[in-house]
Amino acid sequence: NIPPIATSQGDNIRSTRVGEAVILSTQVIDDGLPVTRRDQTITEDALRRRMMRPPSKLTVQKINGLFLAWNVYRGEGKVTFDPPMPKPWEDTRTAANSPWGALWLPPEIPEDGIYEVTATFDEPGTYILWTRADDGGLYHDDYITVNVTE
């Protein structure tokens, strides 16, 4: 397994206005390891039983699968990402959109390897956004700066 590579497309310093969406395109290259375990044929009844089952391990287990997540590294206000981003930290709640959550499934990988996300800012200021490509075993980060005006 080698780390996936996340490369932000476009300028590393961008400008926008409050309320206007910025398109964040990121190319992700990965070797396909570790292998993703996708159980998409699970029935609703089996899913309900799995949700109610007590943990079987004392340590938190991360679900393997390539994903990309954008987050705010520094900034004054709230940033809304669309689609909503998986959390790159341990959040074990079932519906937390985190690889450590019991029912989380990795999102589909775009055919061309380029993930498209929009970011909308609610306050002016300078924001540093970071993106993480994570395959469940290793990860790679990239950063951009966005200057937001009124």
Task: Describe these PLM feature segments.
Residues 62-69:
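Solvent-exposed loop segments of extracellular immunoglobulin-like
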Residues 21, 112, 124-126:
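Extracellular Ig-like/FN3 beta-sandwich strand-entry sites
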Residues 109, 115-123:
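Residue-level recognition of secondary-structure-to-loop junctions
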Residues 1-16, 29, 34-35:
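Short, compositionally biased P/S/T/A/G/V-rich stretches that sit at domain boundaries
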Residues 28-60:
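Short amphipathic, basic-aromatic surface patches that mediate peripheral association
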Residues 140-148:
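C-terminal edge beta-strand
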Residues 134-138:
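Short, solvent-exposed loop/turn segments at the edges of extracellular beta-sandwich modules
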